[in-house]
Amino acid sequence: MNNIKDLDFEELLNNPNFHYNLILKHEKIVKKFDEIITKYMIEDSECAEIIIGKYIYEKNQNRDEIYLPKSLTQNNKEEIIVKYIESENVNLRYLGMVINFPNKFKELNISDKIKLKAKGRYIQESNKIFKNSTGIETEVEVTYDKNQEEPVIYSVDKNICRVSVSRKWIEGNLDFNTLLNNFIYIFSFFDMQMRLSLVSNLSEIGSLERHVFLENSEHFYKISLAFRHKDIISKCQMYSYIEILEKHNIRIEEIIEWFFKYYLKDEFGIENFIVDMPTVNTSYLEKCKLIAIEIDKIIKQYQYYIQDGEIDEELLQISSNSIIFRNCMSIVNNKYVYPNSKVFDIASYLLFSAQSMMGYLPHIGIEYNEFYKLIIKEKVKLLDFENYQIGHIEWLIENKFIMEDKNGYLQFVNENKIYIFLDLYKNGVMSYWNCRKELRDEINILINENIVKFDNKLFTNDEQDYLNYHLNNSDFGNSLALRNRYVHGSQSNDDKLHKENYFIFLKIVIIIIVKINDDLCIKQIAEEKK
């Protein structure tokens, strides 16, 4: 490398087939030709994609580490990005990254003006692409049927997702307890383990969508098609439900205050929980400001109760710390179960992933997307599999997931273990105390084998991400950051938008209520089973 002259190196950079990644992955080359590389990068707007990608994508994503020249300043980087935004050939994905670029990197901070410029170009290019497109539209319809006996009916017809709720059920059960439970059992905000169903779930994202259409970076919340669909439905449910209740002179804010002031005291002996929801005549802008503060108060008070067994009003008044959801503790031990081993990763891939091709046996006319379905529904032997599959089968046998019966047919060794692995594969987490005893016993064995681990937080990891996406801007560049926006005064004058955001805030409060109630109920269950 010492023999390479500057002119020779510049000749390389001028080659039309040259790509910067060829040299930027070599730290020594970048260091030697630092200023030359900087000069050429400033003139090439496409280098913006390299610069942005360096910060957005992680080292563990099968990407080579990129080294930028030290002489490339913050201003240089912004200049290149502006040129990219103004250039003829722009990529919507990278424009999106600029718009949502997180302010957490010392080496690059994209200004709000540049982000706004990128947003304008993004809209312009999107309109060009989708102007004549024939995409599939999906509608959501939430209705309240006076004559319907079943509490809720979900159906899909010609790309219309319909949620039909029994108006008779709602109007016949107007006690506040049931009205809150409707978010669980009617609107399905939660599953039977009280895990939030509205989160962005990796198992709901197809391989093509994950690798082509979504930003594969921890700095962006994954807004998949499935997540958008659930989000739209939940918003429609919130709007319509609140409207129905108001016709019966019931405000959702009153139900929230009742939960903290009366329900917690009557059911769990928790006193002095202070929650003051916005009044009916308050503007939506002020409602958003007030409820953002109340959310912090709610979490702080519950954490004080966990720590001290009581809520200290004076401590609450002097506290100025912001709530960090990942630090919010549960009142019980062993609250959640998470995967924690290579054994889990390998077994789950072989058993449940369509990409493993383990359920594909075309020579005998059997095809299943997942191997575990093949074992459940068919009688197959080791000899029925292709050579490339047999090694994986032997691994599953060796690790006691499957076995051969006396006739040589493959079957599961322990169905409870398979159920746990499947649940964790699909949901990423299990609620230990909300599982039946046989599953808890099997989980205890897996804990001792270091295959899974316990966690003692109030919210699951996915729930923490969901809350942070909606409320804060610390974790995700594309977050709504509603709490930050209203607490710090950086909001618009759009009253319609404030109304939409207020309903999101209300949904967040309902989620927190269900999680707190579940936590306290689990404490009672755990104490009874000691």
Enumerate the predicted regions with their spans.
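Residue-identity detector for glutamine
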Residues: 25, 41, 54, 61, ...
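Short, amphipathic alpha-helical interface elements at domain boundaries
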Residues: 216-381
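Amphipathic, oligomerization/interface secondary-structure segments
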Residues: 315-530
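Long amphipathic alpha-helical coiled-coil/heptad-repeat bundle
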Residues: 1-284
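Sequence-level detector for tyrosine residue identity
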Residues: 20, 40, 55-57, 67, ...
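Intrinsic-disorder-associated interaction segments
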Residues: 22, 26, 41, 45, ...
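Short, flexible helical or helix-coil boundary motifs
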Residues: 44, 59, 187-190, 194, ...
